[in-house]
Amino acid sequence: MTALFQSWGLPYDWAWFVSTIIGILVIALPLMLAVAMIIYADRKIWAAMALRRGPNVVGPWGLLQSFADGAKVFLQETIIPAAANKGLFLLAPIITFTVALIVWAVIPFAPGVVLADINIGLLYVLAASSIGVYGVIIAGWASNSKYPFYSALRAAAQMVSYEVSIGFVLISVVLWTGSFNMSAIVEGQRAHIFGFINGYGFNPLLFPMAVVFLISAMAETARTPFDLTEAESELVAGYQTEYSSMSFALYWLGEYANVILMCGLNAILFWGGWLPPVDWAPLYMVPGIIWFFAKLLFFFFVFSWVKATVPRYRYDQLMRLGWKVFLPLSLFWVFLVSGWLMLTRYGV
């Protein structure tokens, strides 16, 4: 696209800037629309699990319910508590929402369909996603209320705890594929696993890490059964208690954007991304972006299924799972994958 704008007479710097802005909008605007539909799907899945109808009034089959909710929130007044730190109170949801968007810059939807195909894409994802904890901490502190503050402390401890496990899981993936580039990680899953399984993206050696990543992603995004940050019986609405109007909506948008991101990362890192499930010629007639979103939606259904069926963990159980189970397991798997590669790939 930069070359196209240059052909129209724009200098290279301006052509690059305009093409980058267009690329950001092409990703951000559909993502916001996807969040609205994902919220609708989430509510429909919960309703089906509880033998209810769910949203069914606004629009055909209730499809416009999320947009009606968004319009209602947009028209509400933003109320700032008298004792709150006004500047930080308004900044916190912006941080959370912005971080949820910038990570998508390196997510490849199909071959060549990525905003920034950088060689440290996976490292960028880990670094950028870890910034989200600041939005939570600032919200809890700036609200100047005990319930948001307690919730922010819980959220910070929870997010930091499971980021460690996720980091070691990502190291296992990098060792296997030999690259931090997200597109290269997907292409690295084309090879037949162990030379005899003719399938894309399914790696028996990394499968336990796929499970660890999925559960850790639920904890990282504070989804049930790990939503201890907003346990209604203890902390009212968590660190969002004092928020209303669009500032509250930004947290919701950021949360669901992060959920979609984690589902997409799971598909990219462990299940072949845009590659078809098996190496069968007719499956290549389906565009790669369709395979990517099909896998993403499957994992989102798993997220919603777990949320509707699994009871909430106690906080001590949550921390024990992260530090005493997932951390040792993921660290052990780094050594296991390293040893396997030394014996098989490098002939040591």
UniProtKB/Swiss-Prot annotation:
This is NADH-quinone oxidoreductase subunit H. Signal peptide: none annotated. Belongs to the complex I subunit 1 family. GO terms for molecular function: NADH dehydrogenase activity; oxidoreductase activity, acting on NAD(P)H, quinone or similar compound as acceptor; quinone binding. The keyword Glycosyltransferase does not apply. One of its GO terms (biological process) is aerobic respiration. It is found in: Cell inner membrane. Coiled coil: none annotated. GO terms for cellular component: plasma membrane. The chain crosses the membrane at residues 21-41, 87-107, 120-140, 166-186, 193-213, 258-278, 283-303, 323-343. Its EC number is 7.1.1.-. It comes from Rhizorhabdus wittichii (strain DSM 6014 / CCUG 31198 / JCM 15750 / NBRC 105917 / EY 4224 / RW1). The keyword Coiled coil does not apply. Keywords: Cell inner membrane, Cell membrane, Membrane, NAD, Quinone, Translocase, Transmembrane, Transmembrane helix, Ubiquinone. NDH-1 shuttles electrons from NADH, via FMN and iron-sulfur (Fe-S) centers, to quinones in the respiratory chain. The immediate electron acceptor for the enzyme in this species is believed to be ubiquinone. Couples the redox reaction to proton translocation (for every two electrons transferred, four hydrogen ions are translocated across the cytoplasmic membrane), and thus conserves the redox energy in a proton gradient. This subunit may bind ubiquinone.
